[in-house]
Amino acid sequence: MAAPTRSLRRLSSFRTTISPSLTVTAPIGCRSYATTDSSSATNTPGTTRRRATKFQDKLNAGPSFSDFVSGGQDEPLDPSEAYALKTALVGPAGRKKEMTRLPEWLKTPIPDSKNYQRLKKDLRGLNLHTVCEEARCPNISDCWGGSDKSSATATIMLMGDTCTRGCRFCSVKTSRAPPPLDPHEPENTAEAISRWSLGYVVLTSVDRDDLVDGGARHFAETVIKIKQKKPSMLVECLTGDFRGDTEMAALVARSGLDVYAHNVETVEELTPFVRDRRATFQQSIRVLDSAKKAVPELVTKTSLMLGLGETDEQLWDALRQLRAVNVDVVTFGQYMRPTKRHMAVHEYVTPDRFELWRQRALDMGFLYCASGPLVRSSYKAGEAFIENVLKKRRAGSGTAERTVDQTAATTDEATR
């Protein structure tokens, strides 16, 4: 009987060591709660309420839930207040940094519509990629969220989702040795587009410097497949620079497409700091020039990002060089930093400035200019004005079908 006695003594000593004010409220062997003598498990009528914290005071002083849901602002803000940039302190205590918050005019809704989910399902089923997703485009809810597929625009990204270049503004994955091309991609792309009652489609791609032709023949084959399935479809190709090989740019231009697009991205002075070292402003100019010379009636198009630190003089010079090679369409959009690993935003350009540059571009003789904070190179590419211009040019030229046949024969011969 000595062992139980020692155990009880040990328990008694342990209880005293913890706190002399603790009281065990149940026999040994039963689970129980230990409380201090000065407190009680139940509130007495005379117990005072806990004093409100500073956090509660801030909540009570702020807007109500109904104000939060409705936005709290019934009257529109004046331009000076609407365009004002706000800052916030972020980070752990002692290491907080001041960051500029995203302006109100750059905020977009989260995509969740049924049409968005339907388009995404179709693309996944055919193993296709879109630049809308890979480049985290802020307009995806607008372009994919129409009430039906005919009002939607999806920019198909050919040749996989991995690029061989690493531009400092782009969030697309990079690798020196991306996966090989999918030989069924041109047919799958044409099949996906035929399912949607679209009148205009945009094809783009990652840069494939690992391929001899840079993927030019893959582009041409995809355009040919689409035109075979739906000749009335208007096709825009947003290509890379093919390492400056103007013959490959001309090959794509002759494939039967309607708009040849290649983005210079920024002004010439900032190109070495923004784009991959293998890309130059003059190389892009030569690509656009070769496409126009290959098919003079072809609409050529490019895009520039603002907010990277460019000056007005540099923008003027870039536009003059683009007009010198007869580029028809130019777009301006705000650069938005995809992640902290990418180059920082130098300036958030206001909508008024975008409108000013739109007017300047039109005054210089550009056929069309889309300019705004959320505008991207393929955003609303098939607007009625461009579609009407393309249809008029197509009606006035009888060479479109012959060009497609000639390019198809050239592509087949090169493949063999």
Curated annotation (Swiss-Prot):
Where does this protein hold [4Fe-4S] cluster 2? C163, C167, C170
Entry cofactors: [4Fe-4S] cluster
Gene3D superfamilies according to UniProt:
Aldolase class I
Give the GO molecular function terms: 4 iron, 4 sulfur cluster binding; lipoate synthase activity; metal ion binding
Chain spans, region Disordered? 396-416
Enzyme nomenclature, EC number: 2.8.1.8
Origin, by domain of life? Eukaryota
Q: Where is the composition biased (Polar residues)?
A: 405-416
The record's keywords, sorted A to Z, are: 4Fe-4S, Iron, Iron-sulfur, Metal-binding, Mitochondrion, S-adenosyl-L-methionine, Transferase, Transit peptide
Question: Which residues does the annotated transit peptide occupy?
Answer: 1-33
One Pfam annotation reads: LIAS_N
Q: Which residues form the Radical SAM core domain?
A: 148-367
Q: Which residues are listed for [4Fe-4S] cluster 1 binding in this entry?
A: C132, C137, C143, S378
Q: Which reaction does it catalyse?
A: [[Fe-S] cluster scaffold protein carrying a second [4Fe-4S](2+) cluster] + N(6)-octanoyl-L-lysyl-[protein] + 2 oxidized [2Fe-2S]-[ferredoxin] + 2 S-adenosyl-L-methionine + 4 H(+) = [[Fe-S] cluster scaffold protein] + N(6)-[(R)-dihydrolipoyl]-L-lysyl-[protein] + 4 Fe(3+) + 2 hydrogen sulfide + 2 5'-deoxyadenosine + 2 L-methionine + 2 reduced [2Fe-2S]-[ferredoxin]
Q: Give the chief site where it resides.
A: mitochondrion
Similarity comment: Belongs to the radical SAM superfamily. Lipoyl synthase family.
List the PANTHER family hit by this protein, alphabetically. LIPOYL SYNTHASE (PTHR10949), LIPOYL SYNTHASE, MITOCHONDRIAL (PTHR10949:SF0)
Q: Which HAMAP family match?
A: Lipoyl_synth
Q: Name the NCBIfam families on file.
A: lipA (TIGR00510), PRK05481.1 (NF004019), PRK12928.1 (NF009544)
The protein's name: Lipoyl synthase, mitochondrial
